[in-house]
Amino acid sequence: MNNIYQKDLGLQQYTKVFDDMLEFTSTRTPETNDEIWLVEHPAVFTQGKHGKPEHILNSHNIPIVATDRGGQVTYHGPGQAVIYFLLDIKRNKLGAKKLVTTVEQACINMLDKYYNLKAHIIDGAHGIYINNQKIASLGLRIKQGKSYHGIAINTNMDLTPFSYINPCGYSGLKMCQLANFYQEADIKKVQQQYTAEFVTLLNNSI
């Protein structure tokens, strides 16, 4: 497998990172190394490519950005660990379904290994749940065998804006975060822990 470079982008506007993902993906070559971007966003709602406006109940003046990822509307904000996967899935011998499974399983493994939390998936509702409350949302896009976008893990944040929407298109979906279980939850640690689990799974699948 080729090297995967990690980039810690810190706190960045969603639109800037989205544009950078598009630029990276459109200009990469078969020799371009894969990258994983670690980032935190100021408050923003993002709509998936099939997102329905009625799932935004009241934006409360939080910006809304249309994207080309899968899924419906979600919220990003400070204290949420976001990880983006800029991968050549053909080179890594991954299909779209296998990539989604790997992204989800890495989160389940991370929560179990480092926090002794038993997380699960729900058929037909992508994401990671603890006691049927959603702790992580994912949305990916694959273009010409290259992936971008990724997963957002609620870590230590204000969850209130999730009540302004139907998260991922589900009315009344309850959200949770790592800080509900560990008050000192830290997004930098979560990003590193998650990435380690993801890379391990990716290496084992090739």
UniProtKB/Swiss-Prot annotation:
The keyword Membrane does not apply. It comes from the Bacteria. Its EC number is 2.3.1.181. Residues 30-206 form the BPL/LPL catalytic domain. It catalyses: octanoyl-[ACP] + L-lysyl-[protein] = N(6)-octanoyl-L-lysyl-[protein] + holo-[ACP] + H(+). GO terms for cellular component: cytoplasm. Substrate binds at residues 69-76, 137-139, 150-152. One of its GO terms (molecular function) is lipoyl(octanoyl) transferase activity. It is found in: Cytoplasm. It holds the Pfam family LplA-B_cat. Keywords: Acyltransferase, Cytoplasm, Transferase. Gene3D superfamilies: Bira Bifunctional Protein, Domain 2 (3.30.930.10). Pathway: Protein modification; protein lipoylation via endogenous pathway; protein N(6)-(lipoyl)lysine from octanoyl-[acyl-carrier-protein]: step 1/2. The active site is at 168 (acyl-thioester intermediate). One of its GO terms (biological process) is protein modification process. The record marks 134 as: Lowers pKa of active site Cys. Transmembrane segments: none annotated. In the reaction, the free carboxyl group of octanoic acid is attached via an amide linkage to the epsilon-amino group of a specific lysine residue of lipoyl domains of lipoate-dependent enzymes. Belongs to the LipB family. Catalyzes the transfer of endogenously produced octanoic acid from octanoyl-acyl-carrier-protein onto the lipoyl domains of lipoate-dependent enzymes. Lipoyl-ACP can also act as a substrate although octanoyl-ACP is likely to be the physiological substrate. PANTHER family: LIPOYLTRANSFERASE 2, MITOCHONDRIAL-RELATED (PTHR10993:SF7), OCTANOYLTRANSFERASE (PTHR10993). This is Octanoyltransferase.
